[in-house]
Amino acid sequence: MIKVAAAGGGTGGHLYPLLAILETLAKRVDVKVLFFAVKGKIDERVVRKDHPEFETVSIDVRGLLRPLHHPKNLWRTLKIGIATIEVKKHLKRFKPDLVVLTGGYISGVVGLAAKDLGIPIFVHEQNVVPGLAVKVLSQYAKKVFVSFERTRDYLREWQDKIVVTGCPVRETEKEAPLKDFVLVLGGSLGSEAINELMEKVYPELQETQFVHSTGSDDWTERLSVFPNVTALTYIDPMGAYWKKAIASISRAGASTIAEMMYYGVPGILIPWESSAESHQLENALEAERLGYAIVIRENEASPRKIIESIDKVVKKGKIEKMKENPASKISKEILGEIM
Ligand SMILES: CC(=O)N[C@H]1[C@@H](OP(=O)(O)OP(=O)(O)OC[C@H]2O[C@@H](n3ccc(=O)[nH]c3=O)[C@H](O)[C@@H]2O)O[C@H](CO)[C@@H](O)[C@@H]1O
């Protein structure tokens, strides 16, 4: 049996790849998990629901605001200090064999505590451009798993530890009750901008079927008036729908792109350009370069442009599904290091 402490949350984009790794590890060996969730965020809710067997501890932290000298960061830094003491207490008691971290501020807290206690650290970065937590933790990690070859350019000092694996995707046996539709989604929090654009697209494309994850009950009601649209406030598990989709329209969060690539669904990406260091734009451009996507910049995203691009991606057709889930590569690497 191995004991694993894990953190990576605040958004679905960090959480789902982490769950994919833990679920794959559990298929290979007996695993006991201590999960550090961000209080009040998606990780708390999803982990308690999907993995009641994990020991889940909620930690009250928020990320540092940019620019880093933002006045509110003084208070946030103090909270990070308190959280670190709490995390250390749990780690000392649980005595994990390793820590798996997938980014976000909670990873930073858990990673630095684990480093002080000499616990082996494994990190995964989902995006092309690494976030602050992964940049800091790479120096202490045993291995740094990355989704894209290009990420090496941002972590030059740690080349020997980097393994390009791709971004883990959660598996599901479930199947959506529909088929041959265009899947529309924001990130794990939905996207007002995409909802507004698509509301203008739907009446123009009555022959095309859409499934739209709206992010709110109000939007679900508003978009349900279109006969060609199945509007859902949140889709769970998303894999059930990716399997049956012919194309997608979304933001350019790393997990959404990972799922497009894993399930072989070509798509339109409208990156959220205010994301830290424009990382969504970099993700989107990489997905386009790899042949999975058409990128529409926010300032050019009109209903007309989307309609033209839907036609192109649908005509392109499905791409071959990935043979091996990156989660499986990562599990093998981790077990190879510690067993
Ligand atoms: C707003 C924000 O900070 N976004 C970041 C966040 O991910 P954010 O959660 O916004 O976006 P991602 O695309 O990475 O992940 C979304 C995840 O939510 C799932 N989903 C979505 C809708 C739904 O109804 N059901 C469902 O399960 C998707 O299948 C996917 O697994 O972390 C990512 C990884 O570091 C970054 O690339 C994103 O830029």
UniProtKB/Swiss-Prot annotation:
Listed CDD domains: GT28_MurG
Enzyme class, top EC level, equals transferase
Q: Where does UDP-N-acetyl-alpha-D-glucosamine bind?
A: T11, G12, G13, N127, R170, S188, I235, Q280
The record's annotation in InterPro entries points to: GlcNAc_MurG, Glyco_trans_28_C, GlycoTrans_28_N
Q: Which SUPFAM superfamilies match?
A: UDP-Glycosyltransferase/glycogen phosphorylase
Q: How does it sit in the membrane?
A: Peripheral membrane protein
E.C. number, please?
2.4.1.227
GO BP annotations, alphabetical order: carbohydrate metabolic process; cell division; cell wall organization; lipid glycosylation; peptidoglycan biosynthetic process; regulation of cell shape
Gene Ontology MF term list = glycosyltransferase activity; UDP-N-acetyl-D-glucosamine:N-acetylmuramoyl-L-alanyl-D-glutamyl-meso-2,6-diaminopimelyl-D-alanyl-D-alanine-diphosphoundecaprenol 4-beta-N-acetylglucosaminlytransferase activity; undecaprenyldiphospho-muramoylpentapeptide beta-N-acetylglucosaminyltransferase activity
The cellular component terms of Gene Ontology attached to this UniProt record, alphabetical and capped at eight, are: plasma membrane
What is the official name of this protein in its record?
Answer: UDP-N-acetylglucosamine--N-acetylmuramyl-(pentapeptide) pyrophosphoryl-undecaprenol N-acetylglucosamine transferase
Q: Which locations, inside or outside the cell, does it occupy?
A: Cell inner membrane
The primary gene name is murG
Where are the bilayer-spanning segments?
Answer: none
The record ties this protein, via NCBIfam families, to:
murG
